[in-house]
């Protein structure tokens, strides 16, 4: 209670309420739904954790390790009710690309150090409230990157389907190695792998649909379809064990998995080794954040909620650090498992807590059951999962809508396939930013005119509008800054050269959100040049905050013309009566 007698809110309770708002109103009914969702997610996660560890080039138990304590860390610091963190295909492939060239004995500790570094980068970004960095990675880049990575993942798993060895970080390197080793194909592994691909694909494609046709409720049918692969995995384990695939047919299997929870141990590497992991850690942190936040935002939108991107950075950062110190590798939010949890009725991060408990029980009691699981089955699981990540339709739509975005997406896609996953995302981000900057260097600045009998002004090069030779209006479709200020000077000079009768030039600033110091200097120079040519310079439709900044300078004191509230007001005061015969020679467009 404060001095006025009012009860002050408990700051500790307020902090808890802000971070774990989903605890308000939590009851047995919500818990039962979270429990069901957690069981279903665990059934999906057990084989996935083994498969993604295989994809990362690490022992299978590592996939289980990163599915326990990191989930607790995300629940403590993340903002999404529904996001399920853990091993994923894309991040596993990026980890594999990073550690593949390292000596066999250092890969595990290097992967753990990579997770800690990734977590530290995300954590620092969260503390600095740098969630806005997601805006620098365009959706076409993300879509193209995921499509390219999915294809690369599929190619990387061919070796397990054929039961051969192959290495490489690019499509051509992998395919070349696979081709060279095809004579060593293990026919039993090939049979197992192709059978598993066919079965998993048929289940994914048709099981839920068939159950609905048999009058099973749609939601229940979908859940059964998502849980069915674990039954297939169990069947293959039984077949492998009964026929002794490993001993009699030399089929690679998971083998003995150490039982028990992961030990807590901070990975120690030399400074040169840590420097070598820095760039991959930065790239992985970007991809992990963008991918996870996109999934979290989509699920939040479905439930009319919202997420805090800065808290997502903290949650992902904490979970990756925990993954590293428990012998794991980098993780992020899983789109598939999060969607399953949401569809199964999961409502809070209690789902993640329960999944962590179930995975811990798996690590302690169920690992002996998994030792006969063929690698070919895990590879089939990965391949079928990656089919859904390939989205050529989105790339096609992007190309049709925007050629610049299409070029960026295509370059990202090809870079992933030809250069590898790490350089692919960097190439996409850099190219997207370069094209954006290039677009602002020479912004669209058309001369505009008025639709007859209206107060609407449009591009004279595209519309049939009124124009006159006395008052010209140049519409600036971009903020003005140092990189495009000279272009504005050149554009004004061109208009002056082509308009010998002009006495007034209006700069229509509807789209101008900012004018920096360099652009202000250019405007002062333009004003001086026009004044010497007996032409007045005016502004219209200028935003208040831009106008306020101009008032701080003495530019307006020297301005030869005026600042008008609207373009129509400017033309009413400056323009002559319209000459209806003087229309721009263009077809009218609406």
Tell where the protein language model's regions lie, with residue ranges:
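Transmembrane helical cores of multi-pass ion-transport proteins
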Residues: 2-455, 468, 522, 554
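Intrinsically disordered or compositionally simple regulatory linkers and C-terminal tails
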Residues: 2-13, 574-590
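Short linear loop/turn motifs
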Residues: 314-315, 560-571
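C-terminal structured domain segments across diverse proteins
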Residues: 327, 354, 566, 570, ...
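The feature marks cytosolic C-terminal regulatory regions of anion transporters and related permeases
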Residues: 388-553, 557-558, 568, 578, ...
């Amino acid at each position: 209670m404060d001095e006025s007698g009012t009860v002050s809110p408990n700051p500790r309770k307020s902090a808890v309420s802000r971070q774990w708002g989903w605890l308000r109103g939590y009851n047995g009914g919500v818990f039962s739904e979270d429990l069901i969702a957690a069981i279903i997610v665990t059934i999906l996660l057990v084989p996935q954790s083994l498969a993604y560890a295989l994809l990362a080039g690490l022992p299978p138990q590592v996939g289980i390790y990163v599915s326990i304590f990191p989930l607790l860390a995300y629940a403590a610091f993340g903002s999404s009710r529904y996001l399920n963190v853990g091993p994923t295909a894309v991040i596993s492939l990026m980890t594999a690309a990073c550690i593949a060239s390292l000596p066999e004995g250092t890969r595990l500790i290097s992967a753990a150090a990579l997770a800690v570094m990734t977590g530290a980068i995300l954590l620092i970004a969260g503390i600095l409230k740098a969630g806005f960095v997601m805006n620098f990675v365009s959706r076409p880049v993300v879509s193209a990157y995921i499509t390219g990575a999915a294809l690369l993942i599929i190619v990387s798993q061919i070796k397990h389907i054929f039961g051969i060895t192959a290495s490489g970080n690019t499509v051509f390197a992998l395919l070349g190695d696979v081709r060279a080793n095809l004579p060593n194909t293990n026919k039993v592994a090939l049979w197992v792998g192709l059978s598993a691909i066919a079965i998993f694909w048929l289940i994914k494609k048709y099981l839920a649909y068939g159950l609905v046709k048999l009058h099973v409720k749609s939601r229940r049918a979908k859940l059964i379809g998502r849980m069915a692969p674990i039954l297939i995995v169990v069947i293959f384990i039984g077949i492998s064990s009964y026929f002794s695939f490993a001993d009699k047919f030399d089929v690679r299997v998971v083998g003995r998995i150490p039982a028990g929870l992961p030990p807590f141990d901070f990975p120690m590497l030399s400074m040169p080794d840590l420097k070598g992991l820095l760039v991959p850690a930065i790239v992985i942190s970007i991809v992990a954040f963008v991918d996870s936040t996109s999934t979290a935002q989509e699920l939040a939108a479905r439930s009319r909620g919202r997420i805090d991107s800065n808290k997502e950075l903290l949650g992902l950062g904490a979970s990756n650090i925990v993954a590293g110190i428990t012998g794991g590798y980098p993780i992020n939010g899983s789109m598939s498992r999060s969607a399953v949890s949401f569809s199964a009725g999961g409502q809070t991060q209690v789902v993640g807590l329960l999944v962590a408990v179930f995975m811990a029980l798996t690590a302690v009691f169920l690992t002996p059951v998994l030792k006969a699981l063929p690698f070919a089955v895990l590879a089939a699981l990965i391949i079928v999962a990656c089919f859904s990540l390939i989205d050529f339709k989105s790339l096609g739509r992007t190309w049709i809508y925007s050629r610049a975005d299409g070029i960026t997406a295509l370059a990202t896609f090809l870079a992933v396939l030809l250069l590898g996953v790490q350089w692919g995302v960097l190439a996409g981000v850099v190219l997207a930013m370069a094209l954006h900057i290039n677009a602002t260097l020479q912004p669209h600045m058309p001369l505009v005119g008025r639709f007859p009998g209206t107060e609407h002004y449009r591009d004279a090069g595209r519309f049939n509008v009124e124009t006159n030779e006395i008052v010209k209006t140049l519409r600036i479709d971009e903020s003005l800054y140092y990189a495009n200020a000279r272009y504005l000077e050149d554009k004004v000079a061109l208009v002056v050269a082509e308009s010998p009768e002009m006495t007034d030039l209006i700069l229509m600033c509807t789209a101008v959100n900012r004018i920096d110091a360099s652009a202000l200097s250019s405007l002062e120079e333009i004003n001086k040049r026009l004044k010497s040519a007996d032409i007045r310079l005016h502004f219209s439709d200028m935003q208040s905050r831009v106008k306020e900044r101009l008032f701080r300078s003495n530019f307006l004191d020297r301005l030869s013309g005026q600042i008008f509230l609207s373009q129509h007001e400017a033309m009413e005061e400056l323009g002559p009566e319209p000459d209806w015969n003087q229309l721009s020679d263009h077809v009218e467009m609406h």
